Amino acid sequence: MSPADLTGTGRAVPVPGAGLDPGVIAHVAVTATTLWVEPRTHRPDVDGPSLTNPVALDAWNATMQDIETRRWLTGKLESQAVLGSEVIVDEIDGDWARIVVTAQGTARDPRGYPGWVPTAHLVVDEDFAQRAPTSPTATVTALTSTLSARRSGNHPGIDVSFDTILPVLGRTATAVRVAVPGARPACLPAEDVVVHEAGETPPLPTAEDVIATGERFLGLRYLWAGVSAYGVDCSGYTYTLFHHHGISIDRDAGDQMHHSGLEPVEREDLQRGDLVFFATAPGGDSIRHVALYLGDDLIMQAPNAERSVEVMSLTAYDPTGEYAGARRVALAD
């Protein structure tokens, strides 16, 4: 992690990429790491900014302004995991690691979502691992924020994404001091986070809460496998919206429909906040897309590499009748 590991005093900083033996618990040590289907299949001149430490996700997006360059990622990426995410290391192949992200449910692996990431994006940090489940936590509510070595924010560090969750070490009226994997403690602006006490369950959101959160992403460019404020895909978008409000649903659209245990809903009974699903063909069971229902035949979605997060008519989106059903997440009234 850089700049200069968020320069400060205190503990020795663990080295990213060290000690990554199979079976080890590690944590993501960059803004967001992108999981690949296979290692070393990236385009160096395009995807390089997403593979360094620190990552440069804005620069990565800038290399993919045209549709075909962005669409190339389809089927080559698995998911993303933001700073502080817990992972299990399964395999090491040179400077790549096969991991599972424990917070992202999938029918593919009961432990979490699998994929390959650069070893430099991971750190074995025992101090962070001990604090994560027992400390108050700061969840980033801003789309992006910046970790700083000083409470004043005048010593910038690295960017952090929406829904990044880090252990709290202390706080003032203007800043929250957090533990950072693979780095010394750093500060986030208090206005950019919400703090929950250890063991505290966030209040159950209403449909309006979830929709309001989703509306903040309108205009964000689609990114296959994305779950961060630097780009989302359809199910990464819905997963992140509910996860931010303390509700766990599976990572992929098909699993959200078939394996998350959510209540089935008939089309005539749709309510705001329901998840609506679309199949690869009319009447099919293979799910290709999910969107958030807004009422009045409107959906909010991350559609494809050609577009950005948007609101549009459900009927207009589905002229060929690929609507496959809906599920309802339990929400507050």
Located regions from the model:
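Boundary regions of SH3-family modules and the immediately adjacent low-complexity/disordered segments
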Residues: M1-V55, T69-L73, S79, L83-E86, ...
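Short alpha-helix capping/helix-loop boundary micro-motifs
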Residues: R70-K76, T146-P156, H258-E266
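Short, well-ordered loop/turn sites that connect or cap secondary structure elements
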Residues: G75, A81, V160, D269-L270
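Loop/turn positions that initiate beta-strands
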Residues: G84, G157, S161-L166, G273
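Aromatic- and glycine-rich peptidoglycan recognition patches
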Residues: G153, V194, V227, G254, ...
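Catalytic cysteine-centered active-site loop
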Residues: Y222-S235, T240-R272
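Catalytic cores of extracellular degradative/oxidative enzymes
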Residues: E268, T280-D285
